[in-house]
Amino acid sequence: MGKLIVSLSPHAHGTDTVERNMYGVIIALMPALLVSFYFFGIGSAIVCATSVAACVLFEWAINKFMLRNERTTICDGSAVLTGLLLGFNLPSNLPIWIIIIGALFAIGVGKMTYGGLGNNLFNPALVGRAALLVAFPAQMTTWPKVGQLGSYLDAETGATPLAIMKQAIKSGDATILDQLPSSLDLFLGNHPDGAGAMGEICALALLLGLAYMLWKKIITWHIPVSIIGTVFVISGLMHLASPVYANPVAVILSGGLMLGAIFMATDYVTSPMTPKGQIIYGVCIGVLTIVIRNWGAYPEGMSFAILIMNAFTPLINNYVKPKRFGEEVKK
């Protein structure tokens, strides 16, 4: 009789890996990246390349010289993804040295301080963006106009749709909203006066990325739909209450809402684990986004809303737990 050889568990292996998910999200970002190249040209290429290179370099250096890890993590795609998302949250005319500082905060403070991928409390790219917004508010809120393919530091700047909405609320003058691009232009990324951050300009490109990630089962619908749906409903009620508030379609197509809801809030590490927890998380992000956009110091509130709810993710996970195997379901 032959020997029975039993290997260590687990005996069943799936194809879902860190590398697969990271590179899957990177692929999903390609439509938005190509659109940013089309609208911003060399500025977009410089910002994204600098951000990605700096994030990869800082992760390698911290692993090797500070944490002294023998195994590098730069090949798993997480540093590249952080660099891309950070670049997507920046103006296309931002000086290179400021981008490098943002990458240092994203990787050094937002990720490696907690022990690396899987341990971070906050989304690293948003940590980098928030740090730059506090340290360099003028540079981080000066947005170049679209269609300047050969421009970088000398690009013309203009008012973004969110800035127009904010001005209408502050002044109480609803006619200011007439300056907004049409909903179709917002959807396609045609913002003639001021576009905003590179990755948030075209909702169509971001929705293509969402469709790809849902198809590949990289993410589920719960977080993006709950965020966008919450913002749509609340902004719709506000628009009905007063004409100084923009229509809900313009609100969800403007700023970083789509980018944040699809690519930032859905980060595995910093978002809740259960569908119910994800919906609670998404609704809270939507409410906070509306509050900060309309009554906060900055026109955009998506980044801060996500960071705030990142801090509450452990609490949500603690109180919204899946049923344990064998546990009796209460009737």
Where are these regions (language model features)?
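Long hydrophobic alpha-helical segments that form multi-pass transmembrane helix bundles
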Residues: 122-207
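N-terminal signal-anchor module of multipass membrane proteins
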Residues: 1-56, 329
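C-terminal ends of transmembrane helices
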Residues: 9, 57-69, 107-118, 208-217, ...
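Cytosolic-side transmembrane-helix boundaries in multi-pass membrane proteins
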Residues: 1-23, 65, 292-331
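Loop-to-transmembrane alpha-helix initiation sites
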Residues: 121-125, 201, 249-256, 278, ...
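A generic, well-ordered mixed alpha/beta core segment in the N-terminal half of proteins
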Residues: 78-152
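Membrane helical hairpin/interfacial module
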Residues: 34-86
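Structural signature of hydrophobic alpha-helical transmembrane segments
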Residues: 42-54, 93-102, 192-203, 245-257
